[in-house]
Regions:
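Ligand-site clamp/hinge motif
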Residues: 85-131, 248
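Ligand-binding "clamshell"
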Residues: 130-141, 280-282, 296-300
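Structural transition elements
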Residues: 188-221, 237-245
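Short, well-ordered beta-strand elements
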Residues: 24-25, 67-70, 80-81, 96-102, ...
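Periplasmic-binding protein-like
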Residues: 155, 159-197, 242-245
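Ligand/substrate-recognition segments at binding pockets and active sites
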Residues: 76, 220-292
Length: 300
């Protein structure tokens, strides 16, 4: 039905055989531990062959399933509506319909919740958590495999030099971002694998310390004093709890050691359109977040 951007999740498959009505055999070209979790991920869910044949390339906009709700409407950047499935195998849902609204800006989500415009929201900006402490709200917190990181353009510009990349890492006060921007709801990353993957996490790793003097020394060694950096930041989006505040804090830290940083902000989909193809010829760095189902997938 069209290009599948996450096809690499299943690139190890060499054959699929039907054993009986309830059994399928997958043969892989090598051992691949995340395969079962990938099948349980949304990208691995079973779809209706009839629906694929009927809708073709439009199948993604006409989802079909066996859940408690059935697809009703999809208006881009506005809403997705699902209605109660009267034929659900496990009885009917308790509500007639559910409306999903893509409110990428965290402050907008908060305002809508406080005004009664929505009944449920995810990714509450940490600075807004206190607004939902009253008995009329229920807040659920969960630790997850979520990583916020910077994409550095190492192919050209200042960050093509390893010393300049290291300088940026020393220059950014990550503890301050965790405490002041994310209100203590995160931890400083020591590597790309989050602590939520306890079995795959190396507790012996230490993050780069905050050392602006070391950063300045590396910049001087690289001859990059006053280097101009273009920094792409999204206004909000999937996994982005407070991206502008985080980007502004990063900008201030980098400028404190001698960089000249210019932030360019984008709406989420426009941001992805700029960042996903690569930063070459456009920017030196970009803010990004990722949540994954196993420690082997992107961005690792």
């Amino acid at each position: 039905t069209g290009p599948f951007p996450l096809s690499f999740l299943f690139s190890a498959i060499t054959s699929v055989d039907v054993i009986d009505d309830l059994t399928v055999k997958f043969t892989l070209n090598a051992s691949y531990a995340p395969f079962l979790s990938n099948l349980a991920y949304p990208t691995g869910l079973i779809v209706s062959p009839d629906a694929v044949m009927k809708h073709g390339k439009d199948f993604g906009r006409n989802p079909s399933g066996t859940g408690a709700f059935q697809f009703n409407e999809w208006k881009s950047n506005e809403r997705v509506v699902v209605t109660r499935n009267a034929d659900h195998w496990d009885g009917q849902a308790g509500v007639d319909a559910v409306i999903f609204r893509p409110l990428t800006d965290g402050n907008t989500r908060v305002a809508e919740m406080l005004a009664g415009g929505i009944d449920l929201m995810v990714e509450v900006p940490p600075t807004s958590l206190s607004e939902f402490s009253g008995s009329e709200f229920s807040v659920v917190e969960q630790a997850g495999p979520h990583v916020w990181f910077l994409i550095l353009n190492a192919k050209e510009g200042p960050f093509a030099d390893k010393k300049v990349r290291q300088a940026a890492n020393y220059a950014i006060n990550k503890e301050a971002i965790v405490n002041d921007v994310l209100e203590g709801t995160a931890a400083v990353a020591a590597g790309p694998t989050p602590p939520a993957f306890a079995w795959a996490y190396n507790n012996d790793l230490e993050p780069y310390p905050y050392d602006p003097d070391k950063a300045k020394a590396l910049i001087a060694e690289a001859g990059a004093e006053g280097a101009e950096l273009t920094f792409f930041v999204t206004e909000g989006g999937s996994g982005m709890l407070d991206p502008v505040a985080m980007g502004t804090a990063i900008q201030a830290d980098l400028e404190a050691v001698g960089f000249d940083v210019k932030i360019e902000t984008y709406e989420w989909n426009s941001f992805l359109g700029e960042v996903n193809p690569g930063l070459e010829g456009k920017a030196d760095m970009a803010e990004m977040a990722w949540m994954t189902n196993d420690p082997d997938t992107l961005p690792f």
